[in-house]
Amino acid sequence: MTDSLDNARQQARAWLAANVPSGPPPEEGPASRAFVLAWQKRQAESGWAGVSWPREFGGRGASVLEQIIWFEEYARAGAPSPLDASFVGLNHAGPTLIACGTAAQKAFHLPRILNGEALWCQGFSEPGAGSDLASIKTRGRLEGDTLVVDGHKIWSSYADIADYQELLVRTDPQAKSSRALTWIICPMETPGLTVRPIKTMAGPHKYCEIFYDAVRIPLSNVVGGLNNGWPTAMSTLAFERGTASVALMIGLIRKVEQLLAACPADRAAMRARLAGLRAQGASIRAMAYRVALESADTVPDASGSLVRLGFSEFVQEVAAVAIDLFGLDAPQVLRSHGLGYEYLDAFSETIAGGTSEIQRNIIAERLLGLPRGPR
């Protein structure tokens, strides 16, 4: 490691040691919103917000290696999950605006995302269109200088506490597939928009469904142009290297190590199973590093699906082993190790963000060059 990278690590470690909030964050509602915004503001005030964003837009402009170092130290310091309610704004909406937004859109929204003044959610998936976004039905009808939106979105994380939504709608019913979509900025307080939290067995609600009944959005909120929503949404890939997954992997590996330490010495088979998981986690982390570094100067390719598939299934395996280890005492012990929610939510990991089946198709077709399967 070079002196500059070592210095970056020491700076990150020192700042995190002095600033990471103590205790678990609130699980939902207004208290959760206030916590996320305050933590984001604290990072922004010290120049640690938006580490991957270009400096000209208020970010840190960190290299891929510097981003990896930041997220390594972030995880080791026990900082709040990078997948909290700030994730969509920092990793999806913000980068999309940087790539495709107008000067006015950038000037208004980017500082608010970075400085902890506004939260964003995503309005892509629908009850009949999750993995196949090109088939969405929510419609944006053009009326003068306004889009009138009617439809239904689902599985929108933190929509109940968000200020804005990156919304994908169908604006040309005659066009085929993705050529009919438009990416728009949707304020969550717009009349006609209703948010309903979805309760799951995991407890605190994270997911929501959203209903649109003649929601009127000005054309000035269109990003990337009418009927150009698909390439606009894909533009995020030019910034996203998956470096935030490093923090998630390190956090999960640490929990495996905690389970290993709690496993009695006479349970040799279970200890071997946990040791195998520890090695598996290390290999996925190494793969995440490699994918991030190889895409440093290019738009990331389908290699990210390797990391996504490995991580999502690793989460489920860790949760299953923890249950086997503690048996009837598992609910109480898992909570003490911070794994209670992870176990109950683990089943969604291989569905959200692209199912394992879709990730395997991407790997087969785009990386291995195998024939495309039937659709």
Regions found by a protein language model. Name each.
Residues 138-141:
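A structural signal for short hydrophobic beta-strand segments in well-ordered beta-sheet cores
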Residues 82-104, 130, 146:
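N-terminal glycine-rich flavin-associated loop
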Residues 116-124, 168:
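A short, Trp-centered hydrophobic/proline-enriched beta-strand micro-motif
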Residues 3, 193-283, 349:
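Glycine-rich beta->alpha junctions and the first turn(s) of the following alpha-helix
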Residues 65, 69-73, 92, 232-235, ...:
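Glycine-rich phosphate/cofactor-binding loops in nucleotide/flavin-utilizing enzymes
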